[in-house]
Amino acid sequence: MATNAKPVYQRILLKLSGEALQGAEGFGIDASVLDRMAQEVKELVELGIQVGVVIGGGNLFRGAGLAQAGMNRVVGDHMGMLATVMNGLAMRDALHRAYVNARLMSAIPLNGVCDNYSWAEAISLLRHNRVVIFAAGTGNPFFTTDSAACLRGIEIEADVVLKATKVDGVYSADPVKNPDATLYEQLTYQDVLEQELKVMDLAAFTLARDHNLPIRVFNMNKPGALRRVVMGENEGTLIAK
């Protein structure tokens, strides 16, 4: 497909999983992956696209296992929120080193570390071409960072949520287990619900559907994929009404 002369989106919400930041490492943050992602975000800013970012925390902390071992779920989720703040600090630093203006906003107050989340301030920053990183999820336990991505996407009136993953999009089945699995180019919200496709948790997905917020799932590990998505190429899977 021919590349459009201009980006097809003006404002996006990029959802990065914590695992994406760990690269080949089993834990933590791979500095080279972080820097590559910062460069890809920089490309979007240079194209005039307004970028909001939500990052997960699974590379640093996973509450599910500890919850099974008896830890209170609320405590585990609070720890997970702090993990996303750590990832957000790392991403903000990588963007600053790439000469990109970026602000980190947290849904839980962490004075002296990052700004408190403010919807109006976030919109203002985006309009001035600042990258805004949203950390600490929704600020509430029992909600995933996918829910946070959809919530922030709706709040900032993003054109789309771009969910960066390790696979090329949404498949009819797990492509690792089933080599015959089909990659979908486009789906409706109803298709995803009826076929019980694994895109996001139900709370996050329903939020996006109810507010007609399109979701595009793509492989962030493919160099240039993010740019191709915003330029309107058929990269990954688009889920819309």
UniProtKB/Swiss-Prot annotation:
Pathway: Pyrimidine metabolism; CTP biosynthesis via de novo pathway; UDP from UMP (UMPK route): step 1/1
Assigned keywords, A-Z: Allosteric enzyme, ATP-binding, Cytoplasm, Kinase, Nucleotide-binding, Pyrimidine biosynthesis, Transferase
Major subcellular site: cytoplasm
GO molecular function: ATP binding; UMP kinase activity
Binding site for UMP: 57, 77, 138-145
Gene Ontology CC terms: cytosol
GO biological process, one term: 'de novo' CTP biosynthetic process
Enzyme class: transferase
Cysteine disulfide partners in this protein: none
UniProt keyword annotation of Membrane present: no
Function as written in the Swiss-Prot or TrEMBL entry: Catalyzes the reversible phosphorylation of UMP to UDP.
The protein's name in its UniProt record: Uridylate kinase
Organism of provenance: Yersinia pestis
Designated gene of the protein: pyrH
